[in-house]
């Protein structure tokens, strides 16, 4: 930042010095007018033309430098996006696996001693799997009895209810997921409506 300010100050002072030189040359041309011989007149015109070309080149360099800096900044932002959302498609394909493991856990019967070890293994696998995807920025949307938010919820059905406020999420049909702040699947819910 300091380098840019110093560079801008140097560029501005150089431009001001060149403008002063240019004005002095123009004044000297106007005061002497026809008294100067043709060679000196031509030299002065060439110096003026040279000063104009130098100013034009300096402006071009400044403009191109700014454009290069903008390109670098955009590339940095694009790389950050790629790192952040590069896993989006992969994680989206894993969501049905998470759903199936959760469904298995919800219908499992812990009273059967033969299956309890298998159920415990599935539970540990699901926990480990969820911990791993959470490390990469995946968050689930699963709250009920919250206001319906069309940005993260998809209403599957509307149920009339006097016990709940209107537009409240009553039940969760399928969890939704957000990856690094970006919705990758909305939560499918039922919503309350007043009678």
Curated annotation (Swiss-Prot):
Superkingdom of the organism of origin: Bacteria
Gene Ontology process terms (BP): protein folding
A GO molecular-function descriptor: unfolded protein binding
Main localization (coarse): cytoplasm
Keyword match Cell membrane: no
This protein's record includes keyword Glycosyltransferase: no
Key words of the record: Chaperone, Cytoplasm, Stress response
Subcellular location: Cytoplasm
GO CC annotation, single: cytosol
InterPro entries, alphabetized: GrpE (IPR000740), GrpE_coiled_coil (IPR013805), GrpE_head (IPR009012)
Alphabetical list of Gene3D superfamilies matching this protein: 3.90.20.20, Head domain of nucleotide exchange factor GrpE
Subunit note: Homodimer.
Annotated family: Belongs to the GrpE family.
Function of the molecule: Participates actively in the response to hyperosmotic and heat shock by preventing the aggregation of stress-denatured proteins, in association with DnaK and GrpE. It is the nucleotide exchange factor for DnaK and may function as a thermosensor. Unfolded proteins bind initially to DnaJ; upon interaction with the DnaJ-bound protein, DnaK hydrolyzes its bound ATP, resulting in the formation of a stable complex. GrpE releases ADP from DnaK; ATP binding to DnaK triggers the release of the substrate protein, thus completing the reaction cycle.
Name of this protein: Protein GrpE
Provenance organism: Blochmanniella pennsylvanica (strain BPEN)
Source lineage: Bacteria, Pseudomonadati, Pseudomonadota, Gammaproteobacteria, Enterobacterales
